[in-house]
Amino acid sequence: MRQVVLNILIAFLWVLFQDEDSFQFSTFVSGFIIGLIVIYILHRFFGQAFYPKKIWIAIKFLGVYLYQLITSSISIINYILFKTRHMNPGLLTYETNLKNDWAITFLTILIIITPGSTVIRISKTTNKFFIHSIDVSEKEKESLLKSIKQYENLITEVSQ
């Protein structure tokens, strides 16, 4: 976070030092790029990774989540319109490797927001999720657990 604020500060200082009559977005962008270069050179002194890596991870995370949201929404629409009699609702468990409370909460929110599944309970001792799903057939169960594992890996990547 400090790196982002510092980069924006460098960009604004660059705009001020250019002595232009009005604010030019192109000057701000060039200052932002200069700030990126300065921060890249000095990022070892911050004790953190260079921040554009985190931005890329967040964009990748958003893309994966939007893909999962769209595909699960289409799947739920398919169940509602055509397979109402063939639904197999039930519970399944998922054991997570996440340790932070915020990471577990974030994973819970992602599972709840995804259509067709909700978290019923989280075991505090074993970090096991009890999840209700609209269909726990072998194929759907495998698909749901795969997407949850993908969320977990991305949360782990973001938190490092």
Swiss-Prot record:
Listed GO MF terms: antiporter activity; monoatomic cation transmembrane transporter activity
Chain segments annotated as transmembrane: 22-42, 61-81, 102-122
Key words, A-Z: Antiport, Cell membrane, Ion transport, Membrane, Transmembrane, Transmembrane helix, Transport
InterPro entries recorded: Cation_antiport_E
Compartments where found: Cell membrane
GO cellular component, one term: plasma membrane
Topological type in the membrane: Multi-pass membrane protein
PANTHER family the UniProt entry points to: NA(+)/H(+) ANTIPORTER SUBUNIT E1, NA(+)_H(+) ANTIPORTER SUBUNIT E1
Subunit annotation: May form a heterooligomeric complex that consists of seven subunits: mnhA2, mnhB2, mnhC2, mnhD2, mnhE2, mnhF2 and mnhG2.
Family in the record: Belongs to the CPA3 antiporters (TC 2.A.63) subunit E family.
Protein's UniProt name: Putative antiporter subunit mnhE2
Organism in which the protein naturally occurs: Staphylococcus haemolyticus (strain JCSC1435)
Gene name in the database record: mnhE2
